[in-house]
Amino acid sequence: MACLNVANFGPIKRIASTRKGLEERKVTMLIGPQGSGKSTLLKLLCACHWLEKAYAKGLLAQNAFQTADLLKHQFDYYRMASYEQEDTVIDFQGEVLHLSYRHGKLDVDFKQGGQPPAKLLYVPSERSLVSLMKDYKAMRKLPESLLDFMGDYDSAKKYMVGDLNLGLPATSARYDAGCDQMWILHSKNKTRLEEAASGYQSLTPLKLTVEWAGNLQGKEDGDSLEERMARMKQRKLNATDASFGFLNFVEEPEQNLYPDAQVRVLNFLLSMANLRSQNKLMVTTHSPYLLNALTLAVKAGQILQVKKTAGKNMVRILPLKAAILDDDYAVWQLDEKGVVRKLEDFHGLPLDENFLNTAMGKFNSDFGKLQELEDEN
């Protein structure tokens, strides 16, 4: 189990709750207000896993870790260079590396016999832009993480066979390779992705690319040689044996989607995480619907452990493939002060007292106060 401890980096001041910091689980969810550091944590996790994988695959030798430039390049890659402070601390305990960054100095311990890292996919919040930018390779001012995701999306389209089920009623996506055009099919209508609703523009790249990466069996991305070295290495890392698992980092799966569709997307992501025991899913969210959907998935896992026959009726509520064990998830909440805390559980389920439910509760409270004003004489 990988762990990440962070202090004084961007909006993040410290990680409370445990001495090890944030401990990854099969499913890790980050919740909190806008600008509290959810994406920062997600990017740091992905960056550290990328460095670990690059070392394990021989793309980075031990002497490459002698300076902090390697980690600082990751800050640049994710546009977090300005986040570093004089007292920044980053400590990552992985399978084959222990990275410790303090006062601008990087120390690394190399472990022996660790399990090779999994494939990595980072799905950025800006993913809806991919439908608007076909000539993305010429757009060097875009974030590198977004450019890499666009490259992954292009690769996924090449391997697309038939229509892509978007998990929504009577809706699918179809790719026309001849004119490099993605279409959204809804009932009898056919719409170009770039002209479709914003929810489709966010959902289609996410679902197609995650399915491709999660099922990738050693396929190389031919376009990677045209990218600069950082991107080329990223491509090679993702062309690995799928038996080593799949690490999926997703920003805001709920983006531009109706609540019911948000739940469907999370169930899809959970199902992909359950394809292999080594797979992991890490997501950021502002949505109470996703947290509630995760709670349902955990409860389903609890029931299936003791009552196997419950699955016949459970499929009416959620896909059985989305059910997870109660010790296979963790929810971490970030506050406006930059403190990260693990959300406690109640009988294995996420505690109701969290930021997202508090926001919903305040709405109900304010509505009640307005009703009281209305009833005053």
Language model feature labels by segment:
Residues 251-253:
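Walker B catalytic acidic pair
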Residues 264-269:
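Conserved hydrophobic alpha-helix in the ABC-type ATPase nucleotide-binding domain
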